[in-house]
Amino acid sequence: DSRVKLIATATIGFDHIDTAWCAAHGIEVTTAAGCNARGVLQWVGAALVHLSRTQGWQPAERTLGIVGVGHVGSLVKAYAEGWGFRVVCCDPPREERERCGFRTLEEVAREADILTFHTPLDASTRHMADSRLFGLMKPGAILINSSRGEVVDGEALLRSGLGWALDVWEHEPHLDPALLENALLATPHIAGYSEQGKANATAMSVASLARRFGLPLEGWYPPQAAPARRRPISWQELCRTIGGAYDIASESRSLKERPGDFESMRDHYAYRREYF
């Protein structure tokens, strides 16, 4: 029997933990799910602004498909609707539980001009975006992935004729050179790297310890990080301000020029400050 009673990971995922073994040995596992949702939202916002500028469209002219409507996807949905996109969503587990009118993956793929993935990685989502799905999408549609690299079949994406903007990659840190070179945007798995996201993850892990072991630390938050001011932001304001908060195009150029620095870029990242 293990002396370990709790594993509190300060990450949103748990694919690095053998949860079945832990459950069989009475070890509780908690994650920091949702800790960096606003950081990812702002990465997606920066990507959309960049794409609209370089391709010459406005949100009202585009349908945004969202796959996975959890912590991140629900935020992207709310803000994207406010920015003027037509939004269609797919989340089979939530649809089964809640009957909330979400669409099938195939329907969303057919309708979307831009398809963004916000799913965990498990057996049902591995290579969810494959050649069959790409064949349903509009010519010239764009795929965005900031969830897990293995959600997308990279080899099939290369053959798809679609555009893509990727923060996560199969076989990280070893990136497919063609996938990287041809990406509209390419970043080194840092979509959620915000000051507040890091602080939230730490606070959530401490809260798990406090609850499990009766420690007087409920409500603790890292004193050096101010929680984000959550507020609506218009498309016009986003276009004016996002470049000052996060230069996604510059970061993309850096990764394309120095793909071998993938891990170093992550390890020495200057965490962004959330501002909406």
Where are these regions (language model features)?
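NAD(P)-binding Rossmann-fold cofactor-contacting core
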Residues: E81-R99
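Glycine-rich adenosine-cofactor-binding loop
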Residues: A33, L41, Q58-E81
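Oxidoreductase and adenylate-handling cofactor-binding alpha/beta cores
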Residues: L41-W57, G82-F85, T202-R211
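A short helix->loop->beta-strand "cap" motif at the edges of active sites that frequently abuts
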Residues: S2-K5, H25-E28, F85, K138-A141, ...
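Rossmann-like dinucleotide-binding domain for NAD(H)/NADP(H)
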Residues: G140, S146-F276
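Phosphate/diphosphate ligand-binding glycine-rich loop within oxidoreductases
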Residues: D1-G56
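Rossmann-like adenosine-cofactor binding region
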Residues: R94-A178
